[in-house]
Swiss-Prot record:
PANTHER family: ALPHA-HUMULENE_(-)-(E)-BETA-CARYOPHYLLENE SYNTHASE, OS04G0344100 PROTEIN-RELATED. It catalyses: (2E,6E)-farnesyl diphosphate = (+)-germacrene D + diphosphate. Mg(2+) 2 binds at D304, D308. Magnesium, manganese, cobalt or nickel, but not zinc or copper. Binds 3 magnesium ions per subunit. Its main location: cytoplasm. Mg(2+) 3 binds at E455. The keyword Disulfide bond does not apply. It comes from Zingiber officinale. This is (+)-germacrene D synthase. A motif (DDXXD motif) lies at residues 304-308.
């Protein structure tokens, strides 16, 4: 729960201070002190050895599987179980075969699965393949109504649509009510999948949390492959051990930084920040990237609270000017409580830069520009709050797409990604292309829809919900519905850009898609970052605390 109040620290409007008290960290130093989290060295080495043995067996499955449907099911299972980064070459080779196959004889399940697998990997596949499932009246044929497996496959495929692909919109509207009506009749494993993806479709799900949940579903299925199941559990446990080591390092850094203690009005959420990082990339190769990224977003979270929850307008102006200068000498113009934060911000960026290779250090300049841009936009929103100004939706989005952090945060995720993050990537991102704009729209609007009542109750600046209501003279319910439509359009933009990009690596585009997925999860029912004692705690426990018994 939050406690809100307004404090007047002077007579001028610019000196009104909001005071919002967030609940303290629910984790404390758990990931620093709890030595029982990690597996013993001997146990870890046994798991690593067994994983290598199982990897050989799975590679043999690719070689020995000539049936295309079996190959598609193998790839789908491997991806859902979080094993795909072990078999990138095998999957790419298999997808080339799948792309060439004649699918005219395929049923609903096979057609939808092929479409989804190919689209997920950036292949253009025509939606005309679904026309054979429609009758003369233009609707999907009624004989499909009882095919739960096929309907679920169609439902998940429909979320990879782009603009103009109306048949996928129709497929979504057709499949969802049918799945709901069939749910009580399904066997346990399929029912669990339907429930999971009706709550949030596959394309919008965070990978590492999906993997953790899907392993439990997969082990109950009659068609499970025990080699894949054992591999998935061991692999997850090894990943979890790595994550726990990383989180211990970042937690020690956070407590040494002491910002949560000195700025007690901010959200103390380092564990949640790290979990957020995992939603963008969970592969072991990105360990260094995750440490960099965690530091950046934890500092941005503090900035957000300074501008949004505590700082007076004059203090926000002073901080913005200091950040624009980006020099230690700029602290002279800051109030005491901001001097420490400002120096820690500069020092952290300097330390990150020192960790980079010589030919990568330029990346920090792009990240600094992102910080400066978000500070300017935060200041504008602070003015709206003080003045009780409700901007038009267009004016709102001009600033709030930046303050959503959905441009800065993915940019930060590129910094430690090695050779794939070229200067061209940073130039492309800085130009605010459609893929970045779509990512920002998804994050901004989902945040506003979920947080509207809470933030209005404490006197925050107007959200996009209020701006839409003012522009169109409508109520909150209708405004949220229309804004949700904008989110769906943004997803189609992102899907389109995922297919169209030729000069930007798919690994970069995946960061934007994954960040958008994290927004869908965090704002599914409430702001799980701010109110982290709710569903967020359970998700973190699943991913970072509870290992699979093996």
């Amino acid at each position: 729960m939050e406690n809100q109040s307004l404090t007047f620290v002077g007579d001028e409007e610019a000196k009104v201070r909001k005071s919002t008290k967030f609940h303290p960290s629910i984790w404390g130093d758990y990931f620093i002190q709890n030595s029982s989290l990690s597996h013993a060295e001997e146990s870890t080495q046994r798991m690593i050895k067994r994983v290598e043995e199982l990897k050989v067996q799975v590679k043999s499955m690719f070689k020995d599987t000539s049936d295309i449907l079996q190959l598609m099911n193998l790839i789908d299972s491997i991806q859902m179980l979080g094993l795909d980064y072990h078999f990138e070459n095998e999957i790419d080779k298999a997808l080339r075969l799948i792309n060439e196959v004649d699918d005219k004889s395929y049923g609903l399940y096979e057609t939808s699965l092929r479409f989804r697998l190919l689209r997920q990997h950036g292949n253009h596949v025509s939606t005309d393949i679904f026309n054979k499932f429609k009758g003369d009246n233009g609707s999907f044929i009624s004989s499909l109504n009882g095919d739960a497996k096929g309907l679920l496959s169609l439902y998940n495929a429909s979320y990879l649509g782009t603009h103009g692909e109306t048949i996928l919109d129709e497929a979504k509207s057709f499949a969802k009510p049918q799945l709901i009506s069939l749910l009580s009749e399904l066997e346990q494993s399929l029912a669990a999948q339907v429930t999971l993806f009706l709550e949030l479709p596959l394309h919008k799900r965070v990978k590492i949390l999906l993997v953790r949940k899907y392993i439990l579903i997969y082990q109950e299925g009659a068609m499970r492959n025990n080699v894949l199941l054992e591999f998935a559990k061991l692999n997850f446990n090894l990943l979890q051990s790595l994550y726990q080591e990383e989180l211990k390092k970042i937690s020690i850094w956070w407590y040494d930084l002491a910002l949560a203690k000195s700025l007690s009005f901010t959200r103390d959420r380092i564990v949640e920040c790290y979990y957020w990082v995992l939603t963008l990339y969970f592969d072991p190769q990105y360990s260094h990237s995750r440490l960099i990224y965690s530091k950046v977003i934890s500092l941005v979270s503090i900035m957000d609270d300074i501008y949004d929850n505590y700082g007076t307008l004059e203090e926000c102006r002073q901080l913005t000017e200091a950040i624009k200068r980006w020099k230690p000498q700029a602290i002279d113009s800051l109030p005491e409580y901001l001097k420490y934060f400002y120096l820690k911000l500069l020092k952290t960026f300097e330390e990150i830069g020192e960790e980079l290779e010589h030919n990568e250090k330029y990346r920090m300049l792009y990240l600094q520009d992102q910080i400066k841009a978000i500070a300017v936009a935060y200041l504008e929103e602070a003015k709206w709050s003080i003045e009780r100004h409700v901007p038009s939706l267009d004016e709102h989005l001009h600033y709030s797409l930046i303050t959503s952090g959905c441009s800065l945060v993915p940019c930060a995720s590129y910094v430690g990604m090695g050779e794939v993050a070229t200067k061209e990537v940073f130039d492309w991102h800085s130009s605010f292309p459609k893929a970045v704009e779509a990512c920002c729209a998804i994050g901004r609007i989902l945040n506003d829809i979920t947080s509207y009542e809470r933030e209005q109750g404490r006197g925050d600046n107007a959200s996009t919900v209020e701006s839409y209501m003012k522009d169109h003279g409508t109520n909150e319910k209708d405004a949220c519905k229309k804004l949700q439509e904008i989110v769906e359009k943004a997803w189609k933009d992102l899907n389109q850009e995922s297919l169209n990009q030729k000069n930007i690596s798919r690994l970069i585009i995946e960061r934007l898609v994954n960040f958008s997925r994290s927004m869908e999860e965090i704002y599914m029912s409430n702001d799980m970052y701010t109110n982290s004692g709710t569903k967020m705690k359970g998700n973190i426990t699943l991913v970072l605390v509870e290992a699979f018994p093996v």
